[in-house]
A protein has these predicted regions:
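Cell-wall glycan
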Residues: 56-70
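Short acidic-hydrophobic surface loop/beta-edge motif
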Residues: 73-79
Length: 93
């Protein structure tokens, strides 16, 4: 089964996520933004969620993460937890 490794930043609003996406486009490191702004405990690790397969994350998050190319960052994704920016950091087929 294919697994991916991803990092994410979890915030309360779409506006916050969009502002962080602008910071990323302006060259701020994803890991630094995760440490500073993410509400998820993974923020301490730069947002790293380690390796996971399909069925291990909530559906909107999983769909967005598995659609990314390695190194790519998603548009803001809404789940019941809030708004995520997801960065795909590895693919293990």
């Amino acid at each position: 089964m294919m697994k991916i490794r991803a990092s994410h930043i979890l915030v309360d609003t779409k506006e916050q996520a969009e502002n962080l996406l602008l910071d990323l486009k302006n060259g701020v490191a994803f890991e630094d933004l995760a440490k500073q702004y993410s509400k998820c405990p993974s923020g301490r690790d730069g947002g790293d969620l380690r390796w996971f397969g399909k069925g291990m994350m909530v559906k909107p998050f999983e769909d967005a993460a598995f659609a990314l190319k390695e190194g790519e960052v998603s548009e803001p994704v809404e789940t019941q937890f809030g708004w995520h920016l997801i960065k795909l950091t590895g693919i293990d087929e």
